[in-house]
């Protein structure tokens, strides 16, 4: 189960102007009810033991989305690594002649990789306007497919669980709005 927009649930002031939101009972901006709801939901799902797991799409940098090194985590099974996805797709879209100064986009994720249980994903949000095969650089189909093979190899060798959506792993040539 993938939960979108977790950051907007966690903060009372998320996307709001100053003075348009009310602090919690401790004076903070954390949404205590939403935090408790997410913890309870995740504990219940984990307790069922039927193989179901939860993925948080959380972009605010909240520490303790998964059970990693936190006394009071939200208990999601995985946190979707959106920063890795953005950097990865930018790198793959860069012409190979100009990638020399761009390798930090591939390695930066390792600086924070072990702070949470991350899931690397290339999901429907990433392919609304272009198919994966059209996002990689290359002058012809052979170059595109070579880049895709290299990209998949890098992704699968990178630590963390993986998630592909919408047939992009099979070289689907249509983007989401055409399906």
PLM regions with names:
Residues 1-14, 55-56:
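Active-site groove signature of glycoside hydrolases
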Residues 17-177:
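Conserved alpha/beta catalytic core and glycan-binding cleft of carbohydrate-active enzymes
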